[in-house]
Amino acid sequence: MLKEFREQRINEIKQISAKGVNPYPYKFEKTHSSQDIKAQFENLNPGEVKEDASVSTAGRIMSLRHHGKSAFFHIKDFFGRIQAYIRQDIVGKDVYEFFKEHIAIGDIVGVKGSVFKSKTGEVTILVKEIELLNKPLRPMPEKWHGIKDKEVLYRQRYVDMIANDETLNRFRIRFEIIKLIREFLNSKGFIEVETPILEYVTGGASARPFITHLNVFDIDMYMRIATELYLKRFIVGGFEKVYELGKNFRNEGLSYKHHPEFTSIEIYQAYADYEDMMNLTEELFVFIVEKLFGTTKVKYQDIEIDFSRPWRRVKMRDFIKEHLGVDILEDTEEKMLEVLKQHDVEVEIKDKGHLIEKLWDLVEDKVVQPTFLLEHPVEISPLAKKHREDPRVTERFELIIYGREMANAFSELNDPVDQYERFLRQAKLREAGDEEAQMMDKDFVRALEYGMPPTGGLGIGIDRLVMLLTNSPTIRDVIAFPLVRPISFEEEEMNLEGGSQE
């Protein structure tokens, strides 16, 4: 069926060309978006025509209803949909006959005309000129919204965006969030910088890296798992407020909140500590939410998330003790293992840091409203400064919302001797088989030896933030072109032919 449709369309395009019409023109002068037109003419009365108005817009035809020598159709552009009305007595017989014979749902067209409000109160373009801008070779997926196999949507996100306004809007919001983050930080005097994606030594997080090969030097390199260590080199060099927003790569599994290629932002401020980063985090999130929604309250999965300041603060030690009855600072590793066993948690690496992280995993989903989780033990915070009052823990926080880590921040460790010793401990974990332990980065230690001022650092997961603010249940819904298990193009085509859109 798809093959026959394509052949029919190819023949139709030849017919259109034979009539002297270019089915793929080079340009169209679009002066108004659908949103512009509706906003400008919303105050018209039903039935009122604004003859002296002149608009020019373009988009994809999403619906089409013929009525003899006239037709109504809806055009969809990036900002929404708008109705258009075409009549033979206005555009002329030849133009209307061409429209009737060759223009169909899915075609991209440009229209020019005046504006009126229909009797039902819908702002409508009265078409005076129309131009075919593209005739697709594939049919529009009328039942695309009913697909049960979401991997089809992920593989062909472009069609998902065409068919589902909510998908297009979700990504519009995503990039609006990114724009707002930059606007906020730039207004605070932060400078956006760039750091390497290919690294000789990777670090800044506990994760398994991707390995690639650089032919010119004939060496293996790593794709970055975080931007932290190079951003702190900027601070050493004399920058005082920096950030980088970009992709990181971790060779790990897929889940509703994990994706091997993901977007994050890291922010560093000299002469600041983690208290300053908490204030900055609250201020940034409230700025974004209020700009997007005009309120500090957001609905996520039927739960109202309230971003009103100040946010709750709780120590990791206290929270785990409250819910599991184990003290991560005082109790033995045997006691921690016993508690984990009671909850059917298998532990491959019995290092104390891993045990603490496994314990936290058991209780993380109990945090719903924005909460700063404070004072992580030194064992799981190799880049954070020891707490000024209790050296067993660090000046670190994670922002937890709806049971998910949204941000991670420290008073940054700037003692090169302490940093070297912590890298040594991480190196021993790697030797013991922990592929996520951090690598020894001697150049970073050397940078610290030149002196880094007291610094506060903050990292925010952009994808999880977008999930929260678009009410999306899984991370792949907010990544435009996420990873899916590869199948052949032919198999994909067979799936479409077989009615996977039903």
Swiss-Prot record:
PROSITE patterns: AA_TRNA_LIGASE_II
Keyword Kinase annotated: no
Binding site for Mg(2+) 2: 405
A Gene Ontology BP annotation from the UniProt entry: lysyl-tRNA aminoacylation
Reaction it catalyzes: tRNA(Lys) + L-lysine + ATP = L-lysyl-tRNA(Lys) + AMP + diphosphate
Cofactor comment text: Binds 3 Mg(2+) ions per subunit.
Main location: cytoplasm
UniProt keyword Metal-binding, yes or no: yes
Gene Ontology terms for molecular function: ATP binding; lysine-tRNA ligase activity; magnesium ion binding; tRNA binding
Cofactor: Mg(2+)
Localization per Swiss-Prot or TrEMBL: Cytoplasm
This protein's GO CC annotations: cytosol
EC number: 6.1.1.6
First and last residue of the signal peptide: none
Record: residues binding Mg(2+) 1: 398, 405
Keyword terms: Aminoacyl-tRNA synthetase, ATP-binding, Cytoplasm, Ligase, Magnesium, Metal-binding, Nucleotide-binding, Protein biosynthesis
CDD domains: LysRS_core, LysRS_N
Alphabetical list of InterPro entries matching this protein: Aa-tRNA-synt_II, aa-tRNA-synth_II, aa-tRNA-synth_II/BPL/LPL, Lys-tRNA-ligase_II, Lys-tRNA-ligase_II_bac/euk, Lys-tRNA-ligase_II_N, Lys-tRNA-synth_II_C, NA-bd_OB-fold
Assembly information from the UniProt record: Homodimer.
PANTHER family, A to Z: LYSINE--TRNA LIGASE, CHLOROPLASTIC_MITOCHONDRIAL, LYSYL-TRNA SYNTHETASE
Family under the similarity heading: Belongs to the class-II aminoacyl-tRNA synthetase family.
Name this protein carries in UniProt: Lysine--tRNA ligase
Source species of the chain: Thermosipho africanus (strain TCF52B)
